Amino acid sequence: MIKHILVPTDGSSMATLAIHYAVAWARHYEATLHGIHVVDVKLLEGPFLQDISASLGTAPYINYQGNIAMLLEERGRTALEAFEKACAEANIPCDVTLTTGLVARSIVEKSPLMDLIVLGRGGEHNQWLDGLLGSTTEAVVRRTDRPVLVTGRDTPGAGRFVAAYDGSQHARNALHV
């Protein structure tokens, strides 16, 4: 039975749609939703900041890392507030986690406590994916052993869904969701 649903959110339109799906599933199964936003450590410690510093002609990390971390955390809080608002409007119990790390890894590390993960097909760069899965979505699907519902552009509850089945034990387990 589905009692705990993990919903990663970056505040994008696809994440918002995933929240709507998760709310519908939580309502049906009387489940608790667990929202998570991960501040991508690669944006704080990787070449991104060095490139900005070089473009501006300043030494890297002097003030930028702290300022960018604050901005990214604020963006995460905003995304999680929207998640909490959607849950409150639907009278669905929820909790939220704001963390910093590698995005897919952080989601997968939280997944063993969950019965289902619901996430959007793509995130903030979705318009450039040309129908492909976003890198975070693909990494989560490949790495977790939990069932994953990847949402598209349709309205929740709008119709059928597709389940891939190859006869393996993992596929049989997935059908029990």
Regions found by a protein language model. Give the residues of each.
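Gly/Ser-rich helix-loop-strand patches that form or flank binding pockets
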Residues: A15, I19-Y21, R27, V96, ...
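Charge-dense, low-complexity intrinsically disordered segments
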Residues: T9, N63-G66, M70, E74, ...
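Conserved active-site and cofactor/substrate-binding residues in soluble primary-metabolism enzymes
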Residues: E74, T78, S135, N173
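Alpha-helix N-cap and loop-to-helix initiation/capping positions
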Residues: L71, L132, D166-H170
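Short hydrophobic/aromatic-rich motifs at helix boundaries and adjacent loops
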Residues: I52-G57, R77-A79, V108-K110, R146-V148
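Small/aliphatic-rich secondary-structure junction motif
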Residues: M1-N63, A90-I92, P156-V177
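Structural beta-alpha unit
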Residues: M1, M14, D40-L43, G66-I117
